[in-house]
């Protein structure tokens, strides 16, 4: 039976616990340093607490150490990995092959390694190479189609494939974006991306003719594969990853619950083929709705091939759900044509005639007549209106919004000198006199054993042998119940620790895939140099480079309708095309039609 894992982001301990409570089978979280989100660091103690909580449900905790490392950071990074291993972490996500070199040479190292999407995993050859190095799981590039995912699974079936299913998209293949480093000295491969792709650009042809003026031409919509999970499962993916280690707890609650319910519905259709990777069922106080939390509009990206509507040129900000159109304007209010219900405090927005996003807060809602705190000057009848902050929904999620419990059927049995209690592979016993009861005891036994508050368990039944009618004092039943909970938790911790093993690497790994430019290997330290067998570091952050700053499957030529390969009209502009930032800096575009890829170069 195939275990399916819903993998959720955790900015901090609070978000990690919320993710588990709302149905995640695993969470990924950053340590204090060396994660791909500088602003999402956590202490070893918080990570240890998260491991203890998650492991109650057989859920996993993965820690991101997925930046490139400099020589003066190697000792601290190596020490961090061993500390995370001791804290009970289930796997480490890495980008820097210097850390793999450390794992091979250090006998203390026993934790599983996952190849981060930052290692640019888009071909069967790359995944096969990673498998030969000992990676048991590979996080695939977001750009892959379902057919490409299936091909990787068919050719490298013993590697677990992790795919992104929801959240923000990088316009460049992950790990190969150097635009932030080039423009601002902030390395995306060091967790400090300045999000150049979310900025405004002019698009110019070779004669300087302006084809687009100050649009967000590289800003992609957010990924949403919630309707396509079954396709991804059939293609061979086993872990379904939600992006968002900078997102708040309400985002985590809503998105995790939505995807957990969808996975459960798929499993209900195929109970003999699939099951969840962790234990427990969730009871929600709200109905999950992906449109109600942060999103830039949704796309399935390249899941079914190239699509025209994958980017959001008007704004890189969250627009939220469509709620209607502006109908009638008055001095201090307006009407909305639509069926949505509004609440005081809702955040609404619209795209004005200059293609810019404007937002405002609703001070008072009287049905479909809304009174903003201040009337937007550029609001016009007929404009589409979006809600990017739903106050009623936020209030629901601000409270406890889910309870996760593991159903337990106890088996109570007689022993030679007392009684034993068994469930879920754990058995405990007490010494107690076998005293026949004067009246039936089943009701009291069930009541006492069901008092599992403050634990992840709920009693779904108690099995007793036929004719079992002993009097067992309530205090002893309570002691038996407490012993079982303690024994179960200790057994789970031992099981998790015993499962911390690396995937053996081949004695003769295959050769690494070839890159045309040395900096694309991201070699930034002596351990990585030793791994690749080179004498000098080649990382762009240290040496620069003349190759592409970005390699994108998103193509502006296709988006404008000028891709002849896909049935577009013949271009009327003169090559090459350039992107220009507001400060005048230009970037040359190269359209690699053979590989269906747009490359961005510094001019």
Kindly give the residue locations of the regions a language model identified.
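Arg/Gly-rich low-complexity intrinsically disordered repeat tracts
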Residues: 104-110
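Aromatic/His-enriched, Gly/Pro-containing loop or helix-boundary segments
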Residues: 116-124, 139-141
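Alpha-helix capping/helix-boundary segments
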Residues: 98-99
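Surface-exposed amphipathic alpha-helical tracts and adjacent flexible/coil segments at the periphery
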Residues: 1-22, 26-36, 46, 50-51, ...
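An active-site metal/cofactor-coordinating segment within enzyme catalytic domains
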Residues: 39-43
């Amino acid at each position: 039976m195939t275990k399916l894992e819903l993998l959720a982001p955790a900015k901090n301990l609070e978000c990690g616990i919320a993710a588990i409570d709302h149905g995640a089978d695993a969470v990924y979280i950053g340590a204090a340093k060396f994660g791909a989100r500088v602003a999402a660091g956590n202490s070893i103690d918080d990570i240890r607490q998260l491991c203890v909580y998650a492991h109650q449900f057989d859920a996993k905790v993965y820690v991101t150490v997925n930046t490139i490392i400099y020589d003066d950071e190697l000792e601290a990074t190596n020490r961090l990995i061993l500390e995370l291993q001791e804290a009970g972490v289930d796997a480490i996500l890495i980008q820097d092959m210097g850390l793999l070199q450390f794992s091979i040479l250090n006998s203390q190292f026993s934790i599983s390694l996952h190849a981060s999407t930052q290692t640019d995993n888009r071909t069967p050859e790359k995944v096969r190479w990673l498998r030969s190095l000992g990676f048991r799981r590979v996080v695939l590039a977001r750009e892959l189609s379902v057919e490409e995912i299936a091909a990787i699974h068919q050719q490298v079936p013993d590697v677990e494939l992790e795919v992104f299913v929801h959240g923000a998209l990088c316009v460049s293949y992950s790990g190969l974006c150097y635009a932030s480093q080039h423009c601002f000295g902030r390395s995306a491969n060091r967790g400090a991306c300045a999000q150049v792709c979310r900025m405004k650009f002019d698009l110019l042809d070779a004669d300087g003719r302006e084809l687009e003026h100050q649009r967000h031409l590289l800003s992609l919509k957010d990924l949403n594969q919630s309707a396509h999970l079954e396709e991804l499962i059939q293609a061979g993916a086993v872990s379904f990853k939600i992006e968002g280690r900078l997102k708040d707890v309400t985002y985590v609650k809503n998105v995790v619950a939505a995807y957990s319910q969808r996975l459960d519905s798929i499993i209900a259709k195929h109970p003999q083929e699939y099951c969840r990777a962790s234990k427990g069922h969730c009871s929600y106080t709200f109905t999950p709705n992906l449109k109600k939390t942060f999103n830039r509009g949704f796309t399935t990206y390249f899941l079914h091939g190239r699509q025209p509507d994958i980017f959001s040129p008007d704004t890189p900000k969250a627009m939220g759900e469509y709620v209607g159109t502006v109908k009638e304007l008055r001095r201090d209010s307006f009407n909305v044509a639509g069926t949505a219900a509004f609440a005081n405090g809702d955040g609404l927005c619209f795209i004005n005639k200059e293609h810019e996003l404007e937002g405002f807060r609703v001070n008072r809602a009287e049905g479909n007549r809304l009174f903003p705190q201040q009337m937007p000057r550029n609001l016009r009848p007929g404009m589409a209106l979006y809600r990017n902050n739903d106050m009623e929904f936020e209030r629901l999620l601000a409270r406890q919004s889910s309870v996760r419990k593991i159903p337990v059927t106890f088996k109570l049995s007689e022993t030679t000198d007392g009684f034993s209690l068994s469930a879920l592979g754990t058995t405990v016993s007490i010494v107690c006199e076998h005293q026949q009861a004067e009246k039936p005891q089943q009701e009291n036994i069930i009541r006492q054993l069901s008092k599992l508050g403050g634990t992840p368990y709920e009693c779904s039944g108690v099995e007793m042998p036929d004719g079992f009618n002993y009097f067992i004092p309530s205090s002893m039943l309570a002691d038996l119940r407490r012993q079982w909970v303690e024994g179960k938790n200790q057994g789970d911790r031992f099981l998790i620790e015993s499962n911390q093993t690396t995937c053996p690497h081949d004695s003769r790994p295959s050769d690494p895939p070839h890159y045309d430019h040395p900096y694309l290997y991201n070699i930034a330290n002596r351990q990585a140099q030793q791994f690749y067998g080179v004498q000098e570091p080649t990382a762009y952050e240290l040496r620069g480079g003349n190759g592409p700053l970005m390699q994108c499957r998103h193509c502006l030529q296709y988006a404008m309708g000028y891709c002849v390969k896909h049935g577009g009209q013949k271009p009327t502009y003169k090559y090459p095309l350039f992107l220009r930032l507001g400060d005048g800096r230009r970037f040359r575009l190269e359209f690699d039609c053979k590989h269906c890829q747009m490359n961005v170069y510094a001019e």
